[in-house]
Regions:
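A generic transmembrane alpha-helix motif of multi-pass inner-membrane proteins
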Residues: 195, 379-478
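Hydrophobic, small-residue-rich membrane helices and short re-entrant helix-turn-helix hairpins
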Residues: 147-158, 196, 219-248, 265-278, ...
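Hydrophobic alpha-helical segments and their helix-loop junctions in multi-pass secondary transporters
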Residues: 101, 105, 164-191, 209-210, ...
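Hydrophobic, membrane-embedded alpha-helices of multi-pass small-molecule transporters
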Residues: 16-27, 173-180, 189-256, 289-304, ...
Length: 478
């Protein structure tokens, strides 16, 4: 196995294979509902909003995977442990619950229901139909989670091309016969005055940056299996493979958001991206298109849900080995996901926003610290101060994103209004940014002031390890 990082590189075929793996890891049918909804609201400012969306929806996930390798961490629990052991458990649990049974898994059921099942029933008895559909959906998810087989691999290999094929036909139809001019559709809501930052925050909804921290170790392990071990080589090859994936995702987001913007010329506003997607599909392909879409999206989301249930169950089993077994976790997460799914897609998205406003700043700073930690020796004091400052600010971003009636009940409306007026970037949902920078600065100062004591402690620790190793070797020789 090679040690020279300059000679550790993937072949073109291997690069494409890992690019496909990254694409499958991050991109699901649910990802389409956010750019198309963003386009329907941003209208003529869609391209500006898209730039912000691509930063959080495409670039950050790639950086997240890379940071796991560069920081020499064994997954999310290892990277977050650089802040502290207690924090690593808190952040890992919060992240997996978010991309698991609280939001992402329930969304896997409500997206195909909203996009393709609900229109077939003409909006009648929606609660009953959703309950039946989600019950069947999660029964299948649980069955595959308890007894996974090769069918999931087959579904992934067959359905991803099918789904992309259907999407390509939709894009071509929109190009040949657009629903209207994007430039003629006025932006609404926050997109009218702050399209870039609103698009930036909309990218949070993909949850891909969070997923990159959770599943980044999978890509790193694949690279190691191909003889890529040096941190620099891991970063370089991940970026190389990820660039192909990012270009494909960016193109899909571009076309889908433009279609969403064009739809604003003929359709009234929708409650969520699922409704926009089904309206556009029906416009071009009629009810036949809806049925085809129902089949493809349902199975694609089914595969994603199984992956999330198995991932979350396995993680909680490893975090709490003496609590309950893996299969019990799978049952619990499937039942919780079923209950939350029956709130509906719009409610799930709305409830997830405050949580994402809290978690994303912590994820972004952790990713960047993992990437550039070599510059300060991955000193814990820098991780700790940055995280503490960011966490405090993120709590207020969480509060500001709560529904207005909740803020009123908590008597925090005036406080949030004051902060939006006087705290830099707070009104844009980026109030954590300056505190995070201050936290980095404070941590670097502490690291500099304690560098001699830290070096002495490291030398003593290394000497102890060497003595232990030598003693063990002597015993073995005897």
């Amino acid at each position: 196995m090679l040690n020279d990082s300059s000679s550790q590189k993937l072949t073109f075929k291997q690069t494409l294979w890992i690019s496909g793996m990254l694409f499958g890891l991050f991109f699901g049918a649910g990802n389409l509902i956010f750019p198309i909804y963003m386009g329907s609201l941003a209208g003529s400012k869609t391209l500006v909003a898209l730039i912000g969306f691509l930063i959080t929806g495409v670039s950050l996930p790639l950086l997240g995977v890379t940071s796991i390798g560069v920081s020499k961490s064994e997954g999310l629990i290892g990277l977050s442990a650089k802040v502290g052991k207690g924090y690593s458990y808190f952040f890992t649990c919060a992240l997996y619950l978010t991309i698991g049974p609280f939001f992402a898994i329930p969304r896997c059921a409500t997206v195909p229901y909203t996009v393709a099942i609900e229109p077939l029933f003409g909006g009648a008895n929606t609660g009953v139909v959703l309950a039946i559909f989600s019950a069947v959906f999660f029964a299948v998810v649980l069955a595959f989670s308890l007894f996974p087989g090769k069918i999931l691999t087959w579904v992934g290999k067959i359905l991803t091309p099918l789904f992309l094929g259907f999407l390509s036909v939709l894009v071509i139809a929109a190009i040949i016969k657009p629903m209207g001019k994007m430039s003629a559709v006025p932006p609404v809501g926050d997109y009218a005055q702050k399209a870039f930052t609103t698009g930036f925050l909309e990218g949070y909804n993909t949850m891909d940056a969070l997923a990159s921290l959770a599943f980044g170790i999978i890509i790193i392990d694949v690279l190691r299996e191909h003889g890529i071990n040096a941190p620099a080589a891991i970063a370089k090859n991940t970026a190389k493979a990820g660039s192909f994936c990012c270009v494909l995702m960016a193109l899909i987001y571009l076309f889908v958001s433009v279609i969403g913007a064009q739809s604003g010329a003929i359709f009234s506003s929708s409650a969520n991206g699922g409704e926009v997607f089904q309206k556009v599909s029906k416009h071009y392909f009629g009810n036949v298109g809806i049925i085809i879409l129902a089949f493809i999206v349902t199975l694609a989301c089914l595969k994603t849900a199984v992956g999330l249930v198995t991932g979350a169950s396995g993680t909680f089993k490893s975090l709490f080995p003496n609590f309950i077994p893996y299969k019990a976790w799978a049952v619990v997460f499937s039942v919780v996901s079923f209950l939350i799914a029956n709130l509906g897609l719009t409610a799930i998205i709305n409830y997830s926003i405050p949580v994402l406003m809290f978690l994303y700043p912590l994820a972004i700073t952790l990713i960047l610290l993992g990437l550039f930690g070599f510059a300060f020796g991955h000193r814990r004091c820098v991780y700790l101060t940055t995280t503490v400052f960011t966490l405090i600010a993120a709590v207020f971003d969480f509060i500001a994103a709560l529904p207005k009636d909740v803020l009123k009940a908590l008597r925090l409306t005036e406080t949030i209004s004051f902060m939006k007026e006087y705290v830099p970037l707070f009104k844009y949902g980026l109030g954590w940014l300056i505190p995070a920078v201050i936290g980095v600065f404070v941590g670097l100062v502490i690291a500099y002031l304690t560098r001699k004591r830290y070096s002495a402690a490291q030398s003593a620790e290394n000497a102890t390890e060497n003595t232990t190793d030598n003693t063990a070797e002597t015993i073995e020789e005897q």
